[in-house]
């Protein structure tokens, strides 16, 4: 099978970008605006706000009537849905896209043929298609319940009496009555629209690998939901059953057919490195997100001191469908600073539909309609500039390093408020980008020694890609004592570094100058 992918890095870039789309909500919007039978074929990719390396289309798989019915009756969920949609109607609740009855494209989305065409259209952009894989559980009405009940964790009458929120009694097609466990993690009650898969059963593991091999022909990568739950130590802690490792064998099986296939893990509990070692290409960086959200700049910087072999596999984000919207968590200027820290670090840069517009209302994966919200033009303008900066070849495929800020004068400790990076071409010691962020609610100052390597010119021109301001600094002073930086609260700068000769040549080419900032 030909996949017609661009001949660059296997994943588009060493530090690729990803855009998550709420497929069903997008389709509902199209259906309400003149195309009532719209499928994946009607999704106009040209309307997307940027060209990304990856597009993750959320919730394309077939779901069932049982999950839909549960979602429409669950009192707690209904409260959440009404907060999102005050005019909530039953048709807005389709059931969770993670309560899957079959890994075939949902019939309401156009089926597998429409999905194949979507993949071709994504490839035509020079991009790649990512879809969901939910390893921990299946929907209650999945065919395996009758065909292979041994694929699921089963319980007893005592289990369901002791924890009715975690078990369900079902009557099979043959008349047998069995008690099944809901899918869950060890810290929360079960997901009541799902059944827990039994990874202690080798036949179940084989069946899941067969699904993965099929999916590898239908997309280019998978975002693996709660991937750490099927690690043997976590599975045994939750269910008291020993199992063999799943991920190394599963990932190896897929990559033996498609070496360029991408596995991205949703993972928490400091298990990122473990899953990277088991074969995952990328793992969620929830720790950086949490530390930025909690304004812990020192802890965030310490996290970024980890080795590049770890950092380059991290997925940096400020929001996704599980988290509150970034514009709710982070005030305007703080969000901009957090975005520069997150997305100028190495790894995958993960953006969420609605993030660029400053949307504030989180949409449950059970819903297929979102609320009307106005666009925050200030946030939109910021992300437009940030995305342009992220298109730079050096930050997509170059080498990254974390820089330290020294005290600007005795007794001034605001240097601890800074996070700074340098980017250079692969194998080069010539810095091309300098990133400086004051992650604090007050003015801060520092000196940042800049390792300019074999830079031969006396003057360095620094062009701020977020403000278009231009600065000239002495190269020797930038080395020692360092570049003096004074920034206001939550202020960030992304500098493009050039020699004075390069800058003058560009001025002559465009026939003018922007002037110099101080």
Task: Walk through the language-model features, giving the residues of each.
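Active-site and adjacent substrate-binding regions of carbohydrate-active enzymes
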Residues: 2-518
């Amino acid at each position: 099978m030909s996949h017609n992918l661009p001949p660059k890095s296997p994943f588009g870039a060493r530090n690729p970008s990803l855009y998550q789309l709420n497929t069903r909500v997008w389709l509902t919007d199209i259906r309400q605006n003149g195309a009532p039978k719209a499928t994946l074929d009607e999704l106009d990719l040209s309307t997307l706000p940027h060209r990304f390396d990856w597009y993750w289309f959320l919730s394309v798989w077939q779901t069932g009537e049982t999950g839909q019915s549960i979602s429409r009756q669950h009192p707690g969920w209904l409260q959440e849905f009404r907060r999102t949609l005050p005019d909530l109607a039953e048709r807005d609740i389709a059931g969770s896209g993670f309560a899957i009855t079959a890994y075939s494209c949902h019939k309401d989305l156009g089926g597998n043929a429409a999905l194949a065409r979507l993949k071709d259209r994504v490839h035509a952009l020079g991009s790649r298609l990512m879809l969901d894989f939910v390893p921990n559980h299946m929907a209650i009405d999945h065919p395996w319940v009758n065909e292979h009940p041994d694929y699921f964790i089963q319980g007893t009458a005592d289990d369901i009496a002791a924890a009715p929120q975690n078990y369900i009694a079902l009557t099979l097609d043959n008349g047998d009555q069995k008690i099944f466990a809901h899918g869950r993690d060890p810290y929360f009650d079960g997901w009541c629209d799902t059944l827990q898969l039994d990874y202690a059963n080798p036949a179940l593991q084989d069946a899941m690998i067969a699904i993965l091999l099929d999916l590898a022909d239908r997309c280019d990568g998978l975002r693996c939901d709660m991937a750490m739950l099927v690690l043997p130590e976590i599975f045994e802690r939750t269910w008291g059953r020993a199992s063999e490792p799943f991920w190394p064998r599963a990932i190896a099986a897929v990559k033996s057919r498609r070496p360029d296939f991408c596995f991205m893990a949703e993972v928490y509990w400091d298990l990122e490195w473990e899953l990277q070692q088991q074969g995952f290409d990328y793992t969620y960086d929830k720790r950086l997100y949490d530390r930025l959200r909690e304004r812990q700049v020192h802890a965030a910087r310490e996290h970024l001191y980890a080795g590049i072999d770890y950092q380059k596999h991290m997925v940096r984000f400020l929001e996704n469908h599980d988290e509150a919207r970034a514009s709710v968590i982070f005030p305007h200027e703080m969000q901009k600073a957090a975005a520069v820290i997150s997305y100028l670090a190495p790894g995958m840069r993960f953006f969420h539909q609605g993030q660029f517009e400053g949307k504030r209302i989180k949409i449950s994966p059970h819903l297929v309609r979102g609320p009307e919200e106005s666009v925050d033009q200030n946030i939109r303008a910021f992300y437009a500039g940030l995305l342009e900066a992220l298109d730079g070849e050096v930050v997509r495929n170059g080498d990254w390093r974390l820089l330290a800020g020294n005290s600007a004068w005795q007794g001034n400790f605001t240097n601890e408020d800074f996070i700074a990076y340098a980017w250079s071409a692969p194998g080069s010691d010539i810095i091309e980008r300098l990133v400086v962020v004051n992650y604090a609610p007050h003015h801060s100052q520092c000196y940042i020694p800049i390792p300019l390597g074999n830079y031969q010119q006396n003057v360095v021109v620094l062009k701020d890609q977020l403000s278009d301001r231009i600065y000239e600094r002495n190269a020797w002073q930038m080395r020692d004592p360092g570049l003096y930086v004074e920034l206001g609260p939550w202020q960030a700068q992304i500098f493009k570094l050039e020699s004075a000769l390069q800058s003058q040549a560009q001025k002559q080419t465009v026939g003018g100058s922007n002037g110099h900032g101080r």
